Amino acid sequence: MGVFVKMATDSFNVGELALYRGLFAVVVLGVWVLCSHHSFATKHLKEHLLRSLCGTISFLLWFVSLTLIPLSTAMTLGNATPLCMAAIVVIYGLVKKRPTSLVLVCSAIAGFGGVLMIFSPDTNVNLVGAAFALGSSLVTAGSYIQIKALSRLKEPVWRTVFYFSIVNVILGAMLDFCLPETSLETSVGWRDILSLLGMGACGLAAQLCVTRAFDRSNMLVSTILSYSVIVFGILFGFIFFGDAIDLWMVAGTAVIIVTGVISTMSVKKLEEDPDSLL
């Protein structure tokens, strides 16, 4: 999806990207629900709205980062969510005066050390774009916590993704209205249309898969496999956009992946604690 978003940023603003991304999913899921006679109704609207707001804000931040930094960097920093979750759990433990895993603390610190390696002067990273990508990871951590909460409430995966997509459309349209320039003022070609369709299809498939994975509680396996996105991001960035592969970038990415896996293993142990944030 990141490749299609990166391609579309030349012709569409961030609001439009969020709008079209959500619209594709709303149409596809809406038709499926009507044909299969499922119900859109839910008893947990507040939980859906909170998850959808976190998810949409996360994507908006990530879309902005893609306009400022290379795809590989945006993928790496945008997938530092386990480190952000570790930081949240550590802070939560300190506030509640509860014992915190030393492994979790060390892995979080080391992971953010990997982030600093990516910020090395040799990598020439746009700090504003990197900040947006990291902000996306932080908000995504909150979104994942809400997905877990919805799974405990036995909400179906498709309904979680459907409400998320509706909020995509609403916030995207509002942001597009506030931004001065839209795609309607520029020439939109087949390449742009195909980019939007690719973004929508990949985005819908990814959301269904991620939500299903967390719904089945395979948090550790899901997180480890999700790091393959970073590898693909580096390769696709090099192939499609000519992004340079820097030694500091590779080293920092490796540190983030390793510490992210360790953080996830530590966080996984906390899920059994009834007083845990997770």
Ranges and model annotations:
Residues 88, 100-120, 248-267:
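Hydrophobic transmembrane alpha-helices of multi-pass small-molecule transport proteins
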Residues 3-6, 29, 122-181, 277-278:
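Transmembrane alpha-helical segments that form core, pore/gating elements
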Residues 227-278:
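C-terminal-most transmembrane helix of multi-pass membrane proteins
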Residues 74-80, 155-167, 204-238:
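Helix-helix packing/entry segments at the starts of transmembrane helices
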Residues 82-103, 231-250:
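C-terminal transmembrane-helix exit sites in multi-pass transporters
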Residues 1-12, 17-20, 60-71, 77-80, ...:
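Juxtamembrane C-cap of transmembrane helices in multi-pass membrane transport proteins
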Residues 38-63, 103, 128-136, 176, ...:
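Loop-to-transmembrane-helix transition segments
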Residues 11-57, 85-88, 139-143, 163-180, ...:
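Transmembrane alpha-helices of multi-pass small-molecule transport proteins
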